């Protein structure tokens, strides 16, 4: 999408800065991201996005240039654990399943159909279940998830711009092996330790980076 923010859109971002509301750029287009970065006077967050380096073309993740710009802004990218955010294989699985669902629904006359019609939800759930039985889901691993943290740190040269954005409540049964729920956080911490992160680094990743951004946003409010 190459459109520009309306005057009202620019005003909204500026007003969020003014009153101390975080601007979250997960779920926006690349174009919208750069417009936000040109407007905001305080750091922003990507609350549940990962590194597009590992999932080329997947716009819910951030590419290297975006991550670098986010770091310049002082913001943070909070890594999403959903397997489709972590590996290309899982991401392509979703695309192939959607294509199969569309083909399954397509009427013989070729008329357009709304694949996401709420009335078809039960049918879609049943289709997805059968599809998974025939095509087992390629769950990501803890190690592959940790690669995203490493990538951000190496790209920005600092541990200050990455955090945890699990999306435990949003990605359903697609979570990585070893990171299925919050009880798995010791696995994440141990994995970071095994990769050479210090206790102070890990504290930043687990929450201090977000609190730092939060503080800067509050301090920037009028």
Spans of features found by a protein language model:
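Histidine/acidic residue-rich metal-binding segments in metalloenzymes
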Residues: 1-24, 28-45, 59-75, 144-160
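The substrate-binding groove and active-site-proximal loops of carbohydrate-active enzymes
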Residues: 1-4, 22, 52-57, 132-140
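Conserved, mostly hydrophobic/aromatic
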Residues: 23-25, 48, 77, 167, ...
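Active-site environment of divalent metal-dependent phosphoester hydrolases
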Residues: 28-34, 51-54, 84-87, 170-172
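Aromatic-lined glycan-binding groove of carbohydrate-active enzymes
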Residues: 64-126
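Short acidic/histidine-rich active-site segments
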Residues: 79-84, 156-179
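C-terminal helical cap
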Residues: 123-151, 199-214
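Mid-to-C-terminal alpha-helical segments outside catalytic/metal-binding sites
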Residues: 180-222
């Amino acid at each position: 999408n190459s459109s520009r923010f309306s005057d009202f859109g620019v005003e909204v971002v500026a007003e969020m800065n003014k009153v101390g509301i975080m601007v979250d750029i997960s779920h926006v287009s690349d174009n919208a991201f750069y417009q936000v970065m040109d407007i905001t006077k305080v750091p922003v967050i990507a609350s549940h996005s990962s590194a597009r380096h590992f999932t080329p073309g997947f716009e819910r993740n951030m590419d290297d240039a975006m991550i670098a710009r986010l770091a310049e802004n002082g913001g943070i990218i909070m890594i999403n654990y959903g397997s489709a955010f972590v590996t290309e294989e899982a991401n392509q699985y979703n695309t192939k399943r959607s294509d199969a669902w569309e083909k399954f629904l397509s009427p013989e006359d070729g008329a357009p159909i709304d694949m996401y019609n709420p009335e078809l939800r039960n049918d879609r759930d049943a289709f997805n279940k059968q599809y998974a039985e025939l095509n087992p889901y390629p769950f990501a691993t803890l190690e592959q998830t940790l690669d995203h943290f490493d990538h951000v740190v190496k790209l920005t040269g600092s541990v200050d711009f990455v955090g945890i954005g699990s999306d435990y409540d949003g990605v359903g049964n697609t979570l990585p092996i070893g990171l299925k729920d919050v009880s798995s956080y010791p696995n994440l911490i141990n994995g970071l330790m095994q990769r050479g992160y210090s206790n102070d680094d890990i504290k930043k990743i687990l929450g201090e980076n977000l609190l730092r951004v939060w503080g800067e946003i509050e301090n920037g409010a009028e």
